[in-house]
Amino acid sequence: VLKTFDEMDGNTTSKLLGQYHKALALAAVGDFENADKILSGNVNGSLRLTRGSLIAHAQIMAELSKEEEALELIDKMALKGQDNELDLLRQNIQNGKSSYDYITSAQQGIAEVLFTLAFALNGSENDQTSLLYARLAQSLRPNNAETILLTSELLRDQKQFDLAIENYETISKDNSLYLSAEIGRAETLIAADKPDLAIAVLKELAVNYKKSSRVFMSLGDAYRGQKKFMLARSAYDKAQSLIGKPNSSHWFLFYTLGICNERLGNWPRAEMNFRMALDLSPNQPLILNYLGYLLVEKNKKLEEARKMIEKAVAARPNSGFIIDSLGWSLFTLGKFEDAIQPMERAVELMPDDPIVNDHLGDVYWKVGRKREAKFQWRRAISFDPEEKELVRIRKKLEVGLDEVQAQEKKK
C-alpha cells in the first residue's frame, strides 16, 4: 500500500496527495515518527494541503511529545478565536489530553482521499466533479463537519441554496464547527437574496459568541451589503475591539471600516482606516485602488493616488474597476488623451457598469468626441446608476460636461 502512494508522482499535485495520504496511513497504524517526517517536509517537500492536514500533523506531533512544535504550528496557521475546533485542539495539547484520532480506518481514509480531491478541485472549472467527490466523501463519513462544510459551500456556489442550507443545518450545536456552519448558512441566505434572514442568524450568533471577532465581521459584511453603513460600522468596531494587536490578516477589517466611514461622511477616519489596512497589507490591490480612487475623487494627493492605482493595476491587470480608477486618475490630472485607453479597456471588462460608462463619456467629452460622450452617458443611464449620479448624467446630456463642472465650482 505504501508503495502505491510513492508511485503517485505524475505531477506535483498528485505527488503531494500521495505523500499526504501515506502519512495518514502510517499514523493510522501508529507509525507517528515517519508520518511526522512526511508532513514536516523532511521527505519530498513541505506538505500543507488542507485544514485537515494541519489537525492531523498537530495531533501526530503531540503523540511524539512535540507539544511546543504542535502549538507553534497551530498558532502559525490559525488565529485564536477564528476556528473553534483548532482552539479546542490547542487547549487539549496544552493540557496533555490530545491523542491521534483524525484518520483511524480504511473507510475514513477513502473519505479523506475524496475530500482532498474535492478540496483541490474547488474553484476550478471542475465544480461538478468537485461536488461529486464531496458528496461521496460525506456519504462515507456523514458526521464529518469539515466535509459537510465543503459540500455545502459547493452547493451554494452552484446556486443550490436550499440544499446548501439543509446541509449546513446537519451540523449540531455541540460540534466545534457549528459556528462556521451558521456563518456559512448566513452567507448562503445572502446569496439567495434573503438578507434579513441572514442578519437574524448572525445577530443570534453575536449574542451566543460575544467574543468572536469572526461573527461581528460577518454581521458587518451583511449590513454593508444592504448599505446599512452605521450598523455595519458598529459591528466592525466590535470586531476590532476583539482582535487584540492587528496583524496582516486583519487588513480587510480596516478596509471595510474605511468604506463605512467614507460612506457616512467621516473622511478623516476613513483615510486613517484605509492607511491602517495598507500598513498591514502594503501590496493589497483592493486597498490601493479604493484609497487611490477616493483621493482622486476628492482631488487630494493626486500623484500618490496615481501611484497607488498603478500598483493595483500591475497586480490585477484584468480588473475593470481598478483600470477604471487609473483612467479616472489620469482624467482628474488633466491627462485626457492618456485616459482614453484605460477607460476604454475598463468598459470592455465591465460593459454594464454605469460608473465606468459615465467616466468614459467624460473622457470623450474632454477630447472633443462629444457625440460618443453622449452615447456613453446614455448607456450609463440604461444601467441604473444611483439617483445622485443619474441626475448629474442627465444634466451633462442637457448642457454638457463643461457647464456642469462650472456650476459645481460655484457651489
Predicted segments, located by residue:
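Terminal, low-structured helical/coil segments at or just beyond the last alpha-helical repeat
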Residues: 89-120, 354, 366, 370-411
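Generic helix N-cap/helix-start motif at coil->alpha-helix transitions
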Residues: 11-21, 46-55, 67-69, 80-85, ...
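Solenoid-like repeat scaffolds
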Residues: 6-14, 40-49, 75-82, 103-107, ...
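Residue-level detector of the short coil/turn that links helix A to helix B
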Residues: 30, 65, 125, 159, ...
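Position-specific recognition of the canonical hydrophobic site in helix A of tetratricopeptide repeat
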Residues: 27, 62, 122, 156, ...
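Residue-level recognition of tetratricopeptide repeat
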Residues: 24, 59, 119, 153, ...
